[in-house]
Amino acid sequence: MRITIPPKNQGNALVFTLLTVLVIGMALASYLALASSQNVTTMRSLAWTHALTVVEAGVEEALTQIHYNGITNLAANSWNYISPGLYYKKRSLGNGTYCEVVIKPVEPPVILSSGFVPAPMTPSTQLGMILGGVLPGAAADQEIALIKRKVRVNTKRSPWYTKAMLAKGQIDLKGFNVGTDSFDSLDPLYNTLGKYDPAKNKANGDVATNSELVDSLNAGNAKIRGKVSTGPEGTVDVGPGGSVGDKGWVDTGSRGIQPGHVDDDMNVDFPEVVLPEGTPGSVTAGTYSIGGTNYNYVLSGSAAGPRYLQTPSLGGKVYVTGNVALLVSASFSFTGNDCIYLAPGATLTLYVGAPSATLGGNGVINSGSALDFQYLGLNTNTKLAFGGNGAFVGAIYAPYADFQLNGGGNNITDFIGASVTSTVQMNGHFNFHYDEALGRRGPQRDYVVTAWNELVPDSWDEL
């Protein structure tokens, strides 16, 4: 009789279980390795991007230093002079992150900024396969690798007056025979004896707004020899008789906007007006007879530099000699036969804090250029009414003021210069002639970035 011994399935089950665990373990290890690799890649990408924000912080640090100290006092605020003629600062931003910044004090200044961010851990590092990041206590016993990025930034000053008309908000050019063009009072090819000459005009009479609204710029039937610009998604409306373009387009009667003469990328800063340093002298109203005309105010300056004066109110007839800077704090009104007369060679810079100002009457009698008269509105100056029939030669910078133009002149020289305001509302006859010399000789904004180039972050010799 043959006895059958049953197989021992327990051993087979154990082997099968071990093999299964091994396969699952290998799969899990492969998955964890893949997850770790992806995590490290993601963390490195985030660190790489973060390093650029640290670089930007360094650039802002440098621009702020230049804003307050120019390029002649860069040793202020704990900046260190290093050879050859450079200024350096290191700024810690926490968690092992920091930036190093160097300024080269030339005109315009050049900035080098480097950003340093702790690198994420690699899979070979303790717990790196799972964490993918820097361990809190790693710095105590090992040097943490850093991700470094570095840029060279070129700068330049941006002029206040770059357009015939510039506004933060809406521009509405209603009226009759409204037009813009440009000339250059410092280039004899584009002026006659320094004055506007329609036979020598140019087509840079640009009109622009930061507004992003529909109908941000209503050109109406204006003849704009230049370009029109709005903020992102803003629109320009041109009436049936309106024309925007170069001289060939506008002067030949073409209607609408010439291709290439409209864009929607306008985004400029409007810095506040800063008063001159020092204590202003006082101004006394009275009756002053000069050349057979009685004046209410006589403002006498010096030839060397502006004399800083102050008055709570200004109006009537004003006579200006020399270079004068005048603060008008409460009331500014010129109507009827009122005027501001600039003697030959005189300059006047008005700092107007009056909430509502009127510049009408016979306007500003300025035999010089637009560089000789500036109206600067403080943040309390929220309205400026411009009218009368006198020609205006000068520049208006009132970034908080709603600019209302009523009436208009009786010839082609209504407004020579440039305007920068909050909004523009036009009614009447006005021709704007932008003096391009204002862009070169007029006031300048702070330095702005013009070029941004990423470099190898191991030396400062790219300056």
Segments and roles (model prediction):
Residues 2-170, 444-463:
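Beta-strand/loop motifs with alternating small/hydrophobic and polar/acidic residues, enriched
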Residues 148, 154-463:
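Primarily marks folded extracellular/lumenal domains of secretory and cell-surface proteins
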